[in-house]
Amino acid sequence: NYNGYATEITVGSGEKMAGILAHVDVVEAGPGWETPPFQAVIKDGRIYGRGSLDDKGPVVSSLYAMKYIVDNDLLPDEWSIRLIVGADEEEGLRCIDYYNEHAERMPDVSFVPDGYFPMVNCEKGLVDFDLSYDLGKNSDDADDAPEAAITYFKAGLGRNMVPAEAVCEMSVTAEV
């Protein structure tokens, strides 16, 4: 345990290490749930619950894969496998920063089983930006330019979520 930031589970004792990086924190549940979001509900052969896809399902799958490899003697003697589970992936990766600073050693190769099966081969990315539009206040026609202000804007429950909806209210005045 790394002070609640992360934990690790290792099988094998080889010098070479393969890492599996996963996380167990989740973003807010948001609206639209047909089942309790923080309970695992099995419905029509699927598990529903906040974080079952991102990333608790992959954590459990990784544990089963590690057990299968060990039980079937598939891990070469020179290799070990380490599952690193973080608790702060959704809000800034402090878990990985802490782990990097305190772990005795890092894996030689790693992969992240985050998201849809069988594979996600890209990251959506994250960007913060300011949006502005010149209404002509600094031009020769400044007297005729409308005045506008965003009075309210809300989209999503967190900055790292794709929102289900966005709401923007504006105040615009212009002479007619």
Regions found by a protein language model. Name each.
Residues 55-136:
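Acidic/histidine-rich catalytic neighborhood of metal-dependent amide-processing enzymes
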Residues 10-12, 99, 120-123, 160-162:
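Short glycine-biased active-site loop of nucleotidyltransferases that positions the nucleotide triphosphate
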Residues 1-50, 71-79:
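Acidic/His- and Gly-rich active-site-bordering loop/insert found
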Residues 122-124, 128-176:
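Acidic-enriched catalytic cores of C-N bond-cleaving enzymes acting on peptides and small amides
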Residues 12-16, 104-106, 173-175:
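Short glycine/proline-enriched coil/turn segments at helix->beta-strand junctions
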Residues 10, 86, 171-173:
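Short hydrophobic/aromatic beta-strand micro-patches
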Residues 2-3, 22-24, 44, 52, ...:
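Fold-independent oxyanion-binding glycine-rich loops
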